[in-house]
Amino acid sequence: ERATAAGVQQLDGRLRHGELVDTVLEFEPDARLFVLGAHYRASSPSRIHLDHHVERVIRAVRRPVLVATTGQFSPPERFVVAYDGSATAQRTVETVARSPMLKGLPALVAMVGADTPAAHQQLQDAQSLLQAAGFTVETTLMPGEPEQVLPALLKTQGAALLVMRLLVAVRR
């Protein structure tokens, strides 16, 4: 209903059986972006944990994935890039810089870790890349662990979209 009210001309609903990841992979060649609902673990609402089905999809596809939270939708007023300076995080920043999806929104590049000259340089490099693409960019470097620091940061940012790479550590 919201999509139609927003002017979307063509909607396609399908009922599918089988594994979510298999269905998403089937649609991937024709998709530019996937939007999935999230089921956060109630046991730790201050941490970022995704439902295992959503996590499997994110690991399997090569397209960007938006994970929608529960509750009232608010259009993003800014975006926060969770940035660790890795090659993958750098590719994420490059993808954002090329994408029209976030154009016009201010950015915050957030790094969680030790306050070192190398970390400051990595943040500056990410900021410069996004600024060259026309974004207004701030940076922040915070001590702690990303799983605790990022949710707290997002609460201070109002209606913000979190952009992050997938953590490649295998859950055991």
Positions of the model-derived regions?
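N-terminal positively charged helical leader segments and presequences
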Residues: E1-R2, A6, G13-R14
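Short loop/turn motifs at secondary-structure junctions
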Residues: G7-Q10, D30, P75, K103, ...
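Short, flexible loop segments at the rims of nucleotide/cofactor-binding pockets, characterized by
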Residues: Q10-R14, S43-S46, G85, T139-M142
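Gly/Ser-rich helix-loop-strand patches that form or flank binding pockets
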Residues: G13, E19-Q72, L154-R172
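Short, well-ordered alpha-helical microsegments
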Residues: V21-D22, A89-Q90, E147-Q148
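Short acidic/Ser/Thr-enriched loop-to-helix initiation segments
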Residues: R47-R63, T69-A133
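Glycine/small-residue-rich hydrophobic helix-like segments
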Residues: L105-V170
